[in-house]
Amino acid sequence: MYRRFIRPSLSGVALALGACVATDRNFTEPVNVDAQLRQAIDAYGVVPIAAVPAQDSALVALGRALFFDRELSGNRDVACATCHQPSTTMGDAQPLAVGTGGVGSGPSRTPGPGRTYVPRNAPTLLNAALGLPYVFLDGRITGFNGSFTTPAGGALPAGLPNVVAAQAMFPVTNRREMRGEAGDTDVFGRSNELALVGDSDWTGIWQAVTKRLLAIPAYVNAFQAAFPNTSPSQLGFQHAATAIAAFEMQQLTRTDSPFDRYLKRDDAALTPEQKRGALLFFGKATCSSCHNGPFLGGQGFADVGVPQVGPGLATQPPLDLGRGELPGNDFYQFAFRIAPLRNVELTAPYFHDGVYQTLAQVVHHYNDARTDLTTFDPATLRQDVRGMYHGDATTIAAVLNHLDFRLQQPLRLTATEQAELVAFLHSLTDASARDLSALRPATVPSGLPVP
C-alpha cells in the first residue's frame, strides 16, 4: 500500500519551482522545465500506475450484469448504474445522488414523492479499483493489507478479494440508495421484502438479495460460470460483490492520460501550459501536499471549506460532518476523503455535495477557501437543491474552525496561474474515458429495463 506523502521541506525544489513559475510567459519555456518538474514529481511519490491484473471473463460478465440490474434494489427501480452511468463518466452529474423512488434518469433525475436526495454526491467509479485504501467519501470502509474495516464489523463475509468488493456489499443495504423503506412496493406492486429486514441485520439483507438473484435461472448459470467450484447453496452476496469489483477493475480502469505518458518519460506529452500548471500544482499552489502519490490523492481526509448543501446525516442534521460522522473521529469534522484526481476533468460536479460545476470554480475556491466559503452565492446552485444550502454564520464558523491548516492563508494565484492549473488537471484525462457507452448492456438477466 502506498504511504501518504507529506509535503517535503525541499528548499531547492521550492526555489526551482518558484523560479520556473515566475518565468516570463512571453518567452520560450526554460530549457530545464522538465528537469524541475520531474524533481517535484519524484518528491511527492508520483510514479506510473501499475497495470491491474486481468480478470476472469466470466466473473466480469457476471459483474457487468449485476451492476446494471435493478433486481438488486428493494423496489426493483434502481441499479448501481442508476447513480454510476457510463453516459456521465460513472457518476450521475448530480450535485446530490437520487436513489430509490426517484423520477427520471441521469442529470435530470429528481426524488419522487416522499423521498429526498441522498446526502452526498455519487463519486465516479473510474479507477476505483486501483488500490486506494479508503472507500466512500468519509472513508467508512478501509482496506489495508487484505484486512477490511466496514460498518458491518464481524458480519462481513470472508473471502472478499479487495476493498472494492467490500464496498460493493453496502449500497444494497442503504435505504435511500437502493433498499427502500418498510411498506414500499416494487415496480410490480409487490411488497419490498428487502426493506423489511432490520437495518443492523447485515447478513439478513445480503441473504435476501442473493435469494432474489438465484431465483433467476440466467443468474444461476452466470454464477456457476464465474464460481465453478462453489455450489449454489454456498453462494452469498459476497460472490456478487466480487464479480462487481472484477467488472470495475477490468472495465473502469483508465490510466493512459497525457500525464501518465509524461511519467513514462515522454516529455512531449504535456503542453507548455500544462507543464506550468504542473509546476504550480507541485509548488506554489501546494496542491500536492494533499494530492500526492500515484493516484494524486485518495489517501487522507481534510476540511477544505466546502459550503454545506444537502439534507445532512444523522449526527447533526441538516449538516454533514464527513468523516466526523464516524465514531471516534471528532477531529475530522467536515473532513472528506481527499479525491484522487485521475480523470477529474470528466467527473463534475465537485466535492462531496457537488457545489461546483467546473474545475475553474474549484481552483478559485482553493485560492482563498475562507473568502470563497463566506461569500458563496447559493444562486449558483441548481434550483432544486438551493433550498438545502446551509450558509448561516454558525455553520460557516464551524466549517472554518476545522479548516485544514494548508488553506488558512490565501494562495494568491493570478488568473493566469489558475488557468494553468486547470490545464494541468485536464492532462490527467484518459481519452478512452470520454465515451463509456459500450459498457451498457442491452439486457440484463432479470429482464428489467437497463438504466
Predicted regions and their residues:
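Periplasmic c-type cytochrome electron-transfer domains
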Residues: F5-R7, C20-P451
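Bacterial N-terminal signal peptides
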Residues: S9-G18
